[in-house]
């Protein structure tokens, strides 16, 4: 069969790599792809938001199955467009992708269906938000309602910071229309864990847990980013936590969406906070995380096409989802200055060192070919250096070893990815 993957980051590289392992797939296309994906798929110069062009391409090239990696096209309704054209597409429809597309919607859903989450209020008026904050308890969390590349969450320790946050989100519109509505949420403490799942509208199958590192700097300092590294599984995601989440969060979310007339098909990413009062939902994403996909998919034993087709066909209950009993760590190599301002176009060397090593992998995020055919930096997050091992500590040591194999000017990384492993 022919498969089209839509997106251009490390997550899509991980998806393409999993698809390439499927015995059912003869040909992979990726739109728009990147320099690393080009080794596995034919990259097509169509942007992820160019729905009409993507649908035409899929029809003209007799694509059997399309996989959407990114949040923007899902929230924008790309799956609806593919379905209208009679094409099979993996991901939630627009009316279900709102689970990620609107934080206010997801908070209201959790409240209505008693899914554990932080106390909150939604605001569409900056003055009302400021009035509410006058009497609020600090620290407090402000969230832009819409998509903001994982950067629309502000933790405010004082009223002054909160006022500045309201200005940033609602008045200056730093995150554009994403800030038309703002969620004000109680600040929760505990460990953050990500859990990925496959969903077919009624059945949910949990993949594995992972742990992200969102801040740009060592010691969780600096600005929020799309993610500077990850490890899977999380040692803090115990059987007890799993039992609680299965009982009160996972199926409850799928059932809630179905009851609302918004059946969810695709991947639900649960961002959880393990608090003293038990696990609570921080956020939902309607797709694989990045770099969560890079640490979870290499551990999956199943043929990804079998699983994704079962989601689309509503037969996920027949799939026995299996994962290797191992660990995986990803360290992101970024451009110095990310997530604010950085230079691009630097030549990257050292890829050949990964050749023939099954337990090491270099996922490309912000890369492209220059006019001379060299691979150069083309984004804030450039590469995801990933390694598997029998234990988290082994995988971490191997991933950091491999970060030295690749060189480019302005290379930046965190040196404490997986530090929490030592505290487990």
Model-derived features: where do they sit?
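ATP-binding N-terminal substructure of ATP-dependent carboxylate-amine bond-forming enzymes
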Residues: 1-94
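Solvent-exposed alpha-helices and their adjacent loops that cap or buttress functional pockets
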Residues: 20-21, 36-38, 60, 90, ...
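Generic C-terminus detector
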Residues: 367-372, 376-424
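Internal nucleotide-binding/catalytic subdomain
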Residues: 152, 156-293
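A conserved helix-loop-beta module that forms one wall/lid of the active-site cleft
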Residues: 90-152
């Amino acid at each position: 069969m022919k498969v089209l993957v839509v997106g251009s980051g490390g997550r899509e590289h991980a998806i393409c790599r999993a698809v390439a392992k499927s015995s059912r797939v003869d040909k992979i296309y990726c739109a728009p792809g990147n320099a690393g994906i080009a080794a596995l798929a034919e990259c097509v110069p169509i942007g992820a938001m160019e729905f009409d062009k993507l649908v035409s391409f899929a029809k003209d090239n007799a694509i059997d199955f399309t996989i959407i990696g990114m949040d923007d096209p899902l929230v924008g309704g790309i799956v609806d467009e593919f379905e209208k054209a009679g094409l099979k597409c993996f991901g939630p429809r627009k009316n279900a992708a709102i689970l990620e597309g609107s934080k206010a919607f997801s908070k209201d859903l959790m409240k209505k269906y008693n899914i554990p989450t932080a106390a909150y209020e939604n605001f569409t008026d900056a003055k009302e938000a400021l009035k509410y904050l006058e009497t609020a308890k600090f620290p407090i969390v402000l969230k832009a309602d819409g998509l903001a590349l994982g950067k629309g969450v502000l933790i405010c320790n004082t009223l002054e910071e909160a006022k500045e946050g309201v200005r940033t989100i609602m008045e200056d519109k730093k995150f554009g229309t994403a800030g038309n509505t703002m969620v004000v949420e109680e600040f929760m403490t505990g460990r953050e864990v990500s859990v990925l799942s496959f969903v077919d509208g009624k059945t949910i199958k949990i993949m594995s847990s992972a742990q992200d590192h969102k801040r740009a700097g060592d010691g969780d300092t600096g600005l929020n980013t799309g993610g500077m590294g990850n490890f899977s599984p999380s040692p803090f995601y115990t059987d007890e936590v799993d039992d609680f989440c299965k009982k009160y969060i996972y199926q409850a979310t799928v059932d809630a969406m179905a009851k609302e007339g918004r059946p969810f098909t695709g991947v639900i990413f649960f961002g959880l906070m393990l608090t003293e009062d038990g696990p609570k939902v921080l956020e939902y994403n309607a797709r694989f995380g990045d770099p969560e996909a890079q640490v979870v998919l290499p551990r999956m034993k199943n043929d990804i096409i079998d699983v994704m087709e079962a989601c689309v066909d509503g037969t996920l209950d027949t799939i026995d989802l299996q994962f290797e009993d191992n660990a995986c760590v990803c360290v992101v190599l970024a451009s110095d200055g990310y997530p604010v301002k950085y230079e691009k176009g630097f030549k990257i060397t050292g890829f050949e060192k990964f050749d023939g090593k099954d337990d090491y992998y270099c996922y490309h995020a912000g890369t492209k070919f220059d006019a001379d055919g060299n691979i150069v930096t083309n984004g804030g997050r450039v590469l995801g250096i990933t390694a598997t091992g029998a234990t988290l500590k082994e995988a971490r040591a191997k991933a950091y070893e491999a970060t030295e194999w690749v060189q480019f000017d302005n290379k930046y990384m965190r040196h404490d990815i997986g530090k929490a492993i030592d505290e487990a």
